[in-house]
Swiss-Prot record:
Protein name: Probable histone H2A.8
The organism's taxonomic lineage, starting at the top: Eukaryota, Viridiplantae, Streptophyta, Embryophyta, Tracheophyta
Domain of life the protein comes from: Eukaryota
Family of the protein in this entry: Belongs to the histone H2A family.
Keyword vocabulary terms for this entry: Chromosome, DNA-binding, Nucleosome core, Nucleus
Example of a GO MF term: protein heterodimerization activity
Amino acid sequence: MAGRGKAIGAGAAKKATSRSSKGGLQFPVGRIARFLKAGKYAERVGAGAPVYLAAVLEYLAAEVLELAGNAARDNKKTRIVPRHIQLAVRNDEELTKLLGGATIASGGVMPNIHQHLLPKKAGSSKASHADDDDN
């Protein structure tokens, strides 16, 4: 029976490598593949689809976390809280468009004062009174 089965003295079985590590990702490709199959989004799921989706999700998470970290640092804090995520998302035009309908729990609101409620500037009000006196 030479040539069949495992050779005697052959090395141990090759160690399994995850699809996440093959793709250089931190997000779980296998779990995303399982969710895609269980979700019945399509009858079949290609091999590259969960890898691509994991890469996209990882990129978006990294982008939001980077901006939230900057917001936390601007507020002299070392821990990111939901308020920092809210500020990061709402100050970025593309993320606001993507997450416009999403509500971030404990995120608060964006600081905004309507222009009509702000006090009038002293220099501009004198100029407008001078124009009124000419008529």
